[in-house]
Amino acid sequence: MLGKLLTKLFGSRNDRTLKNLGKIVTQINALEADFQKLSDDELKAKTLEFRERLEKGETLDDIMAEAFATVREASVRVFEMRPFDVQLLGGMVLNSNRIAEMRTGEGKTLTATLPAYLNGLSGKGVHVITVNDYLAGRDAENNRPLFEFLGLTVGINVAGIGQAEKKMAYAADITYGTNNEFGFDYLRDNMAFSPQERVQRPLHYALIDEVDSILIDEARTPLIISGAAEDSSEHYRKVNVLIPSLIRQEKEDTEDEVGEGDYSIDEKGKQVHLTERGQEKVELLLIESGMLAEGDSLYSAANISLLHHVNAALRAHTLFEKDVDYIVQDNEVIIVDEHTGRTMPGRRWSEGLHQAVEAKEGVHIQNENQTLASITFQNYFRQYEKLAGMTGTADTEAFEFQHIYGLDTVVVPTNKPMVRNDMADLVYLTASEKYAAIIKDVEGCRERGQPVLVGTVSIEQSELLASLLKNAKIPHSVLNAKFHEKEAEIVAQAGRTGAVTIATNMAGRGTDIVLGGNWKVEIENLTNPTDEQIAKIRADWQIHHDAVIAAGGLHILGTERHESRRIDNQLRGRSGRQGDAGSSRFYLSMEDSLMRIFASERVSGMMKKLGMEEGEAIEHPWVSRAIENAQRKVEARNFDIRKQLLEYDDVANDQRQVVYSQRNELMDATSIQDTIKNIEADVINDLVDQYIPRQSLEELWDVPGLEQRFHQEFGIQLPIQQWLEKEEDLHEETLRERIVASWSDAYQAKEAMVGADVLRQFEKAVMLQTLDGLWKEHLAAMDHLRQGIHLRGYAQKNPKQEYKRESFELFQQMLDSLKHDVISVLSKVQVQAQSDVDDMEQRRREEEAKIQRDYQHAAAEALTDESQASSDNTPKTMIREGDKVGRNDPCPCGSGKKYKQCHGKLS
């Protein structure tokens, strides 16, 4: 109550922000008349003037009003479009490390040109990030004439372009691209072997379009570059056959009664677990199939991988549904994005789930993967010096943007008042009643000539509705993952008179639905259109446009509430753009997944009290509130998952920063001779400590053991016993100095033989390859630690603290191994000439060329409690595959030994 009173008196924080920015808008408007008088050359010269002023010490804020006035006038001359005042407000919000919520149709693409130009003046690079290659290419090409008119360069960074093209794209003042591509380039740069192979500059300013989709929806899907692991496809096939014979437990276990069934499903948590009865049954089936020894347990340490296959197969059969979570196309399982309804070719679920689904569908089973490098979007984007984003729906997630990324959300007002009529939800008892009501509503719209966009949550639901509309003889278009090739065309014409379009979730996002149809698309489809043809198309469009407005504008019809209010708001936001007429309504039933899982008891109780009959719907603010509360619960749960993922990844991120900064220093250094000397002393002293403990009696020394170990590890014969016999005054400290000096002498002899320059190059190559090999193994060890850490909770220990402690120990071991392995390789390998270093580099490049990028997608699971945060819910995504090194192949580190006798030992 008090809060509302204070807001009324002083205005909300959002109001105060807009009021302050409004003063700068007034300044920009005051400059407009002067800028209109400038010639094209004078306007273009402003860019050079601004850059000179920045060099002299002025800040971006000092020149912002003039820079925005420059872009506004250039937009009028290049595009014949004048940015509105609200777009100037949006541009200022984006320049100030904030998120701008701008409604659909308010011109976010043009708004982005304002802060992109301003920050592009610094010459440090601006990254404009979109959700897919199509939007990146479209926005770059659309805005290129404006930026080039003002003297700024534009680059496009999409998948499939070469290294030289990428370098050019990143060298541009403004670079358009997708979040995946920017993240992969960062990982790839940190796997490079020379500064020339890196493509990115330091991360300066990121401007993210559809920021909620990238920073929230995809926050659970880390970017991973990986290599192929061992083939275990036969295991997946054998286990897959066993799962259909298991029975679901319908009733939960109580103190008095154990529910019958082999597995239980937690729908809220999207998890499945074997019951005790199920465990016994699976063990029996595995014994019968010869996969488990008689008397052995599925949960014994030796059978961990078998348990992994069983769990993956169980999840594939019970939690993942064809045409909802994935489709099968061309003998491949292709994931469907739960947020957009689009297919994601090339992406794969992690932890064996994708292979289990492939086994279930009887298609070719691809190999599992081993992580080579990874980063979450959260940690990638937090590295930018400046970060901003825009979307039509951010306010519901404002807390998360602030808590995770430190970004405030500012709701930018619309240019024209919103007149869309958002009607209350209608709730039916059964799905069949709901669909009957939807068909009736669609028929009514068609009779009025009002276009309808029907939003569904899955491909399966969109196809069911399509068949119902077909039976009702209602012409319609279907927009889902199976027909995405026609996406832009279908969306462009979804606003025609009486058009009926079924769209899965937010398919078509980024393309406006124009009332009356899109006349520009019609003109583009003509070859060399005449002025008369263009005039006729525009005149016809105006007639259709007026008819659609008269019929009530675009009607949005939601067939189910999404678990996030934001996704529902995105669907509604397709209607009512730029002050157009429009309406929206959601049709729900008690059989919908959100209602069944989260809101069923309370709403069912209300419906029964009201004595509802078949075909009758309930429409009441209480029901809408109960549904919204259910959505809030799910949003809070999903926020906790993302927060926990980040807390665990922060541990790995600290280590990643250390390793990557070390790599960059190594690559940029002309010589690492001093580093080699330092670690050489550490390694030799550590080795001597094992055989000659410090301040110990000579009787406790194991001199023969030390001589033998030195020969094994470093290929050097040291006559330590002879030294001790001949020189009575040789004590522990002087002996250590003698051993270090002997190694240095042997190494200097090698340097004299091959030349200092060749050896310096070889040292760098060995250090980099060894670091990369150990980092890869460390990531695998971290994965294993993460998957089992939740069990520490049973020992009354905090899993997060244990993870931090043990991961630090693993990291320390990795650094110790790095020192030892580098000195060992440098001691043993005989470098004859520069050609040996070149051969080593060539082998590395061949290995690199084998790595084909592939994506992997995390199964969208919720974590039901703290202990599960580190269990089998770890999303591992977007993977690049490479061939596995055979045990008898030469080790990639260049030591000349077989892999099994070198780095293979470590794994």
Swiss-Prot record:
Entry's Gene Ontology molecular function annotations: ATP binding; metal ion binding; protein-exporting ATPase activity
Compartment(s) where it occurs, according to its Swiss-Prot or TrEMBL record: Cell inner membrane; Cytoplasm
UniProt: Zn(2+) binding residues: C891, C893, C902, H903
InterPro entries from the UniProt entry: Helicase_ATP-bd (IPR014001), Helicase_C-like (IPR001650), P-loop_NTPase (IPR027417), SEC_C_motif (IPR004027), SecA (IPR000185), SecA_CS (IPR020937), SecA_DEAD (IPR011115), SecA_motor_DEAD (IPR014018)
EC number of the protein: 7.4.2.8
Biased composition (Basic and acidic residues): 840-856, 878-887
Pfam family, one: P-loop_SecA
Binding note for cofactor: May bind 1 zinc ion per subunit.
Subunit structure: Monomer and homodimer. Part of the essential Sec protein translocation apparatus which comprises SecA, SecYEG and auxiliary proteins SecDF-YajC and YidC.
Similarity comment text for this entry: Belongs to the SecA family.
Stated name of the protein: Protein translocase subunit SecA
